[in-house]
């Protein structure tokens, strides 16, 4: 019997790097909402009293970027007396956006391999490799450690926003360690929560008393509600439970650490449980395959698992800049597939169109901001881009595709042929 512990982490929306991801995606939303053909590569940096957006934009949209940035920072919770050195109203906002390189644009506008099909005309915005993953550990078909870490982080933000724990401040991190036996989760080994807070907590100022108070409150108002509907729940007697291990966490957010877009790519995806191609998502329009193809790879992997063709599936895609069709497609089922990896790969090539133009069209990636009141990508920028029951994400909706894959497998069995 194999037994091991796997750990994943998440961060709250007030973490400096996540502030940047949300600002970058708010810029993307605003531009696409006005001009769905906008080309965007927006990077954000924050530090004490400063937020700067930079990168490349080609768009007909007219956006008040300074006002937009301040609104995002304020919505997260950095405003007023509790802002702690990073206030939405008073922080400096710098805008340094240029136009996209025409050398890049020509390959995206007119793919090298197009042959009359309009979807062939949209080339990949860059070369690269992307991975998608799914497994049957949770209802959303995500690995349990990252799913739990996100649940805790979302709940931590919720009890701050609704005033349940009014001493909490925006910055925070969660981490969950899960025990596996024979590749199945059997026990929650450790829960770690680090959360920013006011210097005084419910009238307490002694560091140990403050820490104890926060620990008890978080177990009651964060851990228990976040795990209430799960079959595998933390046992306080046996689960190692750590809160603010350094003792206190008063100075946080951009006052404590600088933040950058794209520095939480493992939090954004599968918590390290699957491989990652290295490309970040936030601030990038759908022609950037770092984003759109990673969404498609998740869609493929989730459909394979939902169809019962594998208990675990990892899909690798690769692209060349200016070329529409993927350079390569590979499926790995880690021995859990009903058929071989080669047959699963053939099935994917037969049933999925993974050209950038087709991905963009299927998921309506250019129209999503305008279809959702001007805000879509920003909501993916915190608490993960995959396995989000709180969001209506098109790449998570695999019901019809899973049904067609099931039928294809049934037809194969009936005919006695390989896929």
UniProtKB/Swiss-Prot annotation:
Its EC number is 2.5.1.6. Gene3D superfamilies: 3.30.300.10. ATP binds at residues 15, 171-173, 248-249, 257, 263-264, 280, 284. Residues 100-110 are annotated as: Flexible loop. Keywords: ATP-binding, Cytoplasm, Magnesium, Metal-binding, Nucleotide-binding, One-carbon metabolism, Potassium, Transferase. It holds the Pfam family S-AdoMet_synt_C. GO terms for cellular component: cytoplasm. It is an enzyme of class 2 (transferase). Its cofactor is Mg(2+); K(+). Binds 2 divalent ions per subunit. K(+) binds at residue 43. GO terms for biological process: one-carbon metabolic process; S-adenosylmethionine biosynthetic process. Mg(2+) binds at residue 17. Pathway: Amino-acid biosynthesis; S-adenosyl-L-methionine biosynthesis; S-adenosyl-L-methionine from L-methionine: step 1/1. It is found in: Cytoplasm. It catalyses: L-methionine + ATP + H2O = S-adenosyl-L-methionine + phosphate + diphosphate. GO terms for molecular function: ATP binding; magnesium ion binding; methionine adenosyltransferase activity. L-methionine binds at residues 56, 100, 257, 288. Belongs to the AdoMet synthase family. Homotetramer; dimer of dimers. Catalyzes the formation of S-adenosylmethionine (AdoMet) from methionine and ATP. The overall synthetic reaction is composed of two sequential steps, AdoMet formation and the subsequent tripolyphosphate hydrolysis which occurs prior to release of AdoMet from the enzyme. This is S-adenosylmethionine synthase. It comes from Synechococcus sp. (strain CC9311). The gene is metK.
